[in-house]
Amino acid sequence: IYFEMPPGHFSYWNTTEENREKIRTLIRSGHIDCLHSYGDLATTRAHAVRALEELEKHGCRLKVWVDHAVAPTNFGSDIMRGHGDEPGHPAYHADLTVAYGIRYVWRGRVTSVIGQNCHTSLVGIADRRHLIGSLRTLAKEMGKQVLARCGHRKYTLHAPNRILQRVRLSGDKFQGYEFLRSNPHWNGVSSNETGLGIGEVLTERFLDRLTARRGACILYTHLGKLGSGRKRFNESTILAFRRLADYYHSGQILVTTTRRLLDLFSENESVSPISFALPFWNRLTFPRL
């Protein structure tokens, strides 16, 4: 969820009080678990204060921060061009946001590698059905790996291929985690990362490779982007989610929320996904809205 957006964009302040209550219900139930910056129009610390006071007032707790586009309140100053952790900047808010409870931040890092928290492998990126495009994607990922091993800060997360890494925000005392997301589409991390195109991502090829590697994945996607004039998922997307559900119900893939997965790995930092017992999680039941 985000707060300050232009007219026509769904956000907390742009909707009705009835819909805001629905948002709060979904935060409390755990279905909405990420703060997606404070929005495109949030340019000052005061905007952050207003949003955090609203969340606090209604008992809504979020632990995950996800940078959005190039919003001023983003934490990532390189890819996402944010200023949220720059003391002295009008958009600085890191101290307030961390005090509120944010523990995990995403600052724009995305990989094409299928499966994290297992050894780095570029196998599965190249696809002979889309040879030229997939080889281009493979070359980009190889470049990230080389730069990461040369100490390039932008790609620090890529070399170990771990979902989480301890991080300190620039100019702030925040001791938390930065996390890595993945989009395994053959044409690169910015392809079909939408509700319209996710059917081209959640393929049998990807799911089989993920299960074979026994890895983890926080998928990079924007499910609300359905294409011009569309209000529902298309048939390809529906079939993709049914496919994922089949893998879940057959015990091959654990499907969970971002916050739950990050909590799991932060509590088991030194081991791989196959080395620890999965916790007992209360079933997420969609609330009556």
Language-model features: where?
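Catalytic alpha-helical scaffold of carbohydrate-active enzymes acting on polysaccharides/glycoconjugates
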Residues: 1-184, 197-220, 228-289
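His/Asp/Glu-rich, glycine-adjacent segments
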Residues: 190
